[in-house]
From Swiss-Prot:
One Gene Ontology term of the molecular function aspect: toxin activity
Species of provenance: Neoponera goeldii
Transmembrane segments: none
Modified residues (Lysine amide): 20
Protein name: M-poneritoxin-Ng1f
UniProtKB keywords: Amidation, Antibiotic, Antimicrobial, Cytolysis, Hemolysis, Membrane, Secreted, Target cell membrane, Target membrane, Toxin
Protein task: Has activity against Gram-positive bacteria. Has insecticidal and hemolytic activities. May act by disrupting the integrity of the bacterial cell membrane.
Length: 20
């Protein structure tokens, strides 16, 4: 559960990069 949340948190910067 915690590992999944950590994975999502790590993916956030990549998603933000797509919008920039």
């Amino acid at each position: 559960f915690i590992g999944t949340a950590l994975g999502i948190a790590s993916a956030i910067p990549a998603i933000v990069k797509l919008f920039k």
